[in-house]
Regions:
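N-terminal helix-turn-helix DNA-binding core of bacterial DNA-binding proteins
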Residues: 1-43
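Generic recognition of well-ordered alpha-helical segments
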Residues: 29, 74, 89-92
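Proline- and acidic/polar-enriched loop/turn elements at helix boundaries
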Residues: 43-44, 61
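Short, hydrophobic-biased segments on the C-terminal half of alpha helices
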Residues: 46-49
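Glycine-centered, phosphate/nucleic-acid-interacting loop/turn motifs that mediate DNA/RNA or nucleotide
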Residues: 53
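Short beta-strand "wing" residues that participate in macromolecule-binding interfaces
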Residues: 57
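Basic, amphipathic "hinge/linker" alpha-helix immediately C-terminal to the N-terminal HTH DNA-binding motif
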Residues: 62-84
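Amphipathic alpha-helical dimerization/coiled-coil segments
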Residues: 79-109
Length: 109
């Protein structure tokens, strides 16, 4: 598995929260398919995105206590749109290098 940059982590969190209002532990679980991210890594990201105005929080009762939920803001949605554009460009550049390498190996083999 490849290391996840801070920007990619932000993009992934914003994307998950854009799908549904959700809470930290669920975000961690949802991210496990793509990245090994612990709660201790995720919560500072959530706090930073909240402080920057990309996310907002609210509490919802759950089993007799409050659970903190996150929702994306208009600013967060705009950031996510840009992250998606940047990701497609970056992914295309990486794909072109990886595919070129595979073709070169087959040609030389």
């Amino acid at each position: 598995m490849f290391p996840i940059s801070a920007a990619l982590l932000d993009a992934m969190v914003l994307s998950l929260v854009a799908r549904e209002e959700t809470y930290g532990y669920k975000i961690t679980q949802d991210m496990q398919t793509a990245a090994k991210v612990s709660e201790s890594t995720l919560y500072p990201v959530l706090r930073r995105l909240q402080k920057n105005g990309a996310l907002e929080t609210f509490d919802r009762a759950y089993m007799g206590r409050n659970r903190r939920y996150y929702r994306i803001t208009a600013l967060g949605a705009a950031m996510l749109r840009q992250y998606r554009i940047d990701w497609e460009e970056h992914k295309g550049q990486i794909d072109s290098i990886l595919k070129e390498k595979e073709e070169t190996q087959h040609d030389n083999g």
